[in-house]
């Protein structure tokens, strides 16, 4: 869902009730792990920028919750941990078919790795 919300707080008020808790948890983890990043709304969803470049984002899409980890080294290091039923992923996108499929420990690990990464952004 491409939101027109100008702030993440407003965005979270728009999302479907069954996804709200998971999206709030994603935001909490992003804010804790990505110190020094700017929280913005980009591409219709919450995004986290460093030096003007979006490195992480998430969104409630029509059929899934999308988590966007845009550091290629971080995605590559976590691919095996993402190979679970109900989760699909590509170059920088992770798609969770249901909120309960999100392994927040893996997400936290990816966010911490993003904070430390100097790798390429896809």
Question: What positions do the PLM features span?
Answer:
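Charge-dense, helix-prone N-terminal extensions
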Residues: 1-122
């Amino acid at each position: 869902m491409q939101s027109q919300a100008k702030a993440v707080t407003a965005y979270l008020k728009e999302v479907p009730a069954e996804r709200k808790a998971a999206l709030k948890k994603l935001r909490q983890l992003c804010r804790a792990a990505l110190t020094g990043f700017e929280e913005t709304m980009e591409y219709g969803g919450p995004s986290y920028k460093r030096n003007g470049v979006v490195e992480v984002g998430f969104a409630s899409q029509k059929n899934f919750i999308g988590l966007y980890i845009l550091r290629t080294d971080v995605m590559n290091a976590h691919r095996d941990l993402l190979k679970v039923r109900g989760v699909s992923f590509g170059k920088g996108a992770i798609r969770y078919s249901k909120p309960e499929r999100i392994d927040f420990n893996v997400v936290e690990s990816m966010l911490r790795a993003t904070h430390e990464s100097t790798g390429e952004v896809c």
